[in-house]
């Protein structure tokens, strides 16, 4: 798993430099026991997200600094609410979209789930961009209660699950 993490950290910027034929996102999800929250950071290529928004919502949407950032945040929040489903202890959770920042060739999105009490399991269903790119792969790095696990999600296997026994 450590090698996969290192590979992805190196590969993402390199792949971004060229016109990419690979479709993937990377999400880091960390449980904060003191704040009773799951903090997530998702990285998605600009052009892939833009294509999804243009096909799904409005052909004029641009995922860049020239587009109205409040509108862009609203589209990102709406899309993530539909495509990123978090369940804690078997119960679906409300996502709190915090915002995004622009990086070279990709968008970094910040999301949080709050009010997590007595954590026994976390399930993450991630279908980001799979409706536009069937070959899309979504990597999840999950860190909670001393456990670290990475998942590679695809169209046929789009759910990650981590259980904690007392």
Functional labels for PLM-detected ranges:
Residues 14-19:
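Sec/Tat signal peptide C-region and signal peptidase I cleavage site
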């Amino acid at each position: 798993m450590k090698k996969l993490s290192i590979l992805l950290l190196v590969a993402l910027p390199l792949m971004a430099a060229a016109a990419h034929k690979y479709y993937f996102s990377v999400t880091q999800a960390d449980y904060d026991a003191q704040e009773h929250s799951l903090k997530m950071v998702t990285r998605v290529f600009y052009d892939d997200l833009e294509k999804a928004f243009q096909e799904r919502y409005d052909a004029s949407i641009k995922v860049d600094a020239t587009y109205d950032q409040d509108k862009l945040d609203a589209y990102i929040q709406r899309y993530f609410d539909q495509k990123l489903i978090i369940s804690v202890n078997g119960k679906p959770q409300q996502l709190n979209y915090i915002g995004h920042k622009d990086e070279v060739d990709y968008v970094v999105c910040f999301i949080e789930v709050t009010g997590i009490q007595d954590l026994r399991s976390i399930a993450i269903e991630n279908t980001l961009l799979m409706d536009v790119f069937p070959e899309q792969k979504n990597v999840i790095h999950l860190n909670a209660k001393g456990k670290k696990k990475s998942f590679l999600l695809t169209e046929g296997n789009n759910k990650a699950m981590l259980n904690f026994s007392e």
